[in-house]
Amino acid sequence: MKFIVKLYPEIMMKSKSVRSRFTKMLETNIRNVLKKVDEDAKVQRQWDRIMVRVPADRPELVDAFAERLGCIPGIAHVVQVNEYTFDSVDHIYQQVLPLYREQLAGKTFCVRVKRTGQHDFKSIEVERYVGGGLNQHTDAVGVKLKNPDLTINLEIDHEKLYMVVRRIEGLGGFPMATQEDVLSLISGGFDSGVSSFQFIKKGARTHYCFFNLGGSQHEIGVKQVAYHLWKTYGESHKVKFISVPFEGVVQEILERIDNGQMGVILKRVMMRAATLLADKYGIQALVTGESLGQVSSQTLTNLNVIDRCTDLLILRPLIAMDKQDIINQSRIIGTEDFAKSIPEYCGVISQKPTVKAVLSKIEAEELKFSENLIENIVAQAKVIDIKDIAIEMDNQIAAAEAETVVAVDTQEVVIDIRAQEEEEKNPLSLPGKTVMTIPFFKLSTQFADLDKSVTYLLYCERGVMSKLQALYLIEQGYTNVKVYRP
C-alpha cells in the first residue's frame, strides 16, 4: 500500500531551485510526522510528488498515515493506491476487472487515467479499453463520462500501475519552515486560533505568546488550543509557548490610565512586550486575530496607533473576515470547542472606549506607567517547548495529587470528554463499566451537578485534554477526579 502525495500547485509554479527546496522540506516534514506513528515509515521524494509506503505487515497504519498526511501544510491532496506491474493494456484491464466487478453492478461508471513515462499507448486508449471491457463483462448500467456513480482512477508511472483506493484532500499552503518564524498572540478564542492556523498553513513556524489576564484556569485553556494546533498541523517542528504574567499591567492601567484610552494602551503594551520576545528569539513578525471593526480597539485609526509602538511587522490575517466566517473556520480546524469553553477575560474594560485614538494623548498616558514595566514583565515570562505541555500537565497533576489510572473499579465512572465527532468515530467500549459522555467544553459547568460521592475518571485518546481538565477541576476544589489512561 502506498500514498502518493501531490504538491500544492503554488509550489509547482516556483522556479526550479525554490521548488526543489520546498519539496525537500515537505519530504522532511512528512517523515518527521509519520515517524511519530511508525519509526519504519518510508518517505521518498520525486520531482512532482512524494511517495509514502505503508509496511505490508502493518495495514493498521493506513488510516493513521492518511489522517496525518491530510494535516501537513504544502500538500494539495493525497491518493491512497495499490501498486501493480503490467506488460500490456490488456494486462491492466485483467487486473482491474476482479477488483471492480461487484462494485459496478447496477451503476454507471467511467475510467480516468493519468500517465507518466514513455509507452506505446495513450491515456485515452487505456480508458477506452478498460472501460469497454468492464462495460461488457460486468453488470454495470453503462459508461457515463459526466457525473457517473463510480469513477475508476488509474495512475500509470512507467512500468507501474496504481489503482486509486481513495483521495484525501490536503491543507494546501506551503511546507512548514519554508517561511520565516512568527509569534502569534493567542488568547484561546476563535480569532487567535484561526489566525495562528493561517500562518501554519502558509509555512511559517508559529510560536505562541499568551498574556495571562485570567489566572491559571485561563492559561490551561489557552495551552489546550495551542497544543491542538501544533499537534495537529505543526508537529514536524519545535515551537515555543510563552506565557507572560499580565496582572500587574492590568492593575497599573486601571489605576493610572484615562478610562477611554485603556483598550488601545493595553494592546500597545502587549505589542511592545511581544516585540521584546520576538527580538530575543529571532522571530520576524507578530500575528494577531484582530478583525476590522470587531471591537473598539480595532478601528483603522486605533490599529494605526497600536502599530506605531513597534517597528516589528504586525500581521492580521483575519482583518477583513466576518465573525461568522471565523467561527466556521475554527470549526473546520478543530478549535471551535476550545474557544467555546474559554471565558472572555476582559481585565480592562473602558466605559466609553475611544474609536479614534490620538497618538500624542496615548503616549502622554503611557508616561504614567512604572519605570521598566514592560521589561520587568517580559523578564518573568515562562518559555516552554510546546511538546512539553503534556509533561508539564503530568507534573502538575502529580503535585495536585490527582491519580492517573489504567483500570476502572466497579464503583468508578468514566467520563469520555472527547468532542462528539471523535466519540462517534471511535466509541469507548468498557463492558460492565459505567461510561458517560460530556464534551470537555461542557465539563466545567456540568461537573458540579454530578454525584460528589462518586469518583470520575476523565478519558480522551491522547491523554492531554483529560489531564488539563483534571487540573482545572482540582483547582476548583474537586477531589473526586482522576485521569484514565488505558
UniProtKB/Swiss-Prot annotation:
CDD domains: PPase_ThiI, RHOD, THUMP_ThiI. Residues 408-486 form the Rhodanese domain. ATP binds at L185, I186, K267, G289, Q298. Keywords: ATP-binding, Cytoplasm, Disulfide bond, Nucleotide-binding, Redox-active center, RNA-binding, Thiamine biosynthesis, Transferase, tRNA-binding. The keyword Nucleotide-binding applies. Pathway: Cofactor biosynthesis; thiamine diphosphate biosynthesis. The keyword DNA repair does not apply. It catalyses: [ThiI sulfur-carrier protein]-S-sulfanyl-L-cysteine + a uridine in tRNA + 2 reduced [2Fe-2S]-[ferredoxin] + ATP + H(+) = [ThiI sulfur-carrier protein]-L-cysteine + a 4-thiouridine in tRNA + 2 oxidized [2Fe-2S]-[ferredoxin] + AMP + diphosphate; [ThiS sulfur-carrier protein]-C-terminal Gly-Gly-AMP + S-sulfanyl-L-cysteinyl-[cysteine desulfurase] + AH2 = [ThiS sulfur-carrier protein]-C-terminal-Gly-aminoethanethioate + L-cysteinyl-[cysteine desulfurase] + A + AMP + 2 H(+). It is an enzyme of class 2 (transferase). Its EC number is 2.8.1.4. It is found in: Cytoplasm. Pfam families: Rhodanese (PF00581), ThiI (PF02568), ThiI_fer (PF22025), THUMP (PF02926). GO terms for molecular function: ATP binding; CCA tRNA nucleotidyltransferase activity; tRNA binding; tRNA-uracil-4 sulfurtransferase activity. Disulfide bonds join C346-C460. SMART domains: THUMP. PROSITE patterns: RHODANESE_3 (PS50206), THUMP (PS51165). Residues 63-167 form the THUMP domain. The active site is at C460 (cysteine persulfide intermediate). Catalyzes the ATP-dependent transfer of a sulfur to tRNA to produce 4-thiouridine in position 8 of tRNAs, which functions as a near-UV photosensor. Also catalyzes the transfer of sulfur to the sulfur carrier protein ThiS, forming ThiS-thiocarboxylate. This is a step in the synthesis of thiazole, in the thiamine biosynthesis pathway. The sulfur is donated as persulfide by IscS. Belongs to the ThiI family. PANTHER family: TRNA SULFURTRANSFERASE. This is tRNA sulfurtransferase. It comes from Shewanella denitrificans (strain OS217 / ATCC BAA-1090 / DSM 15013).
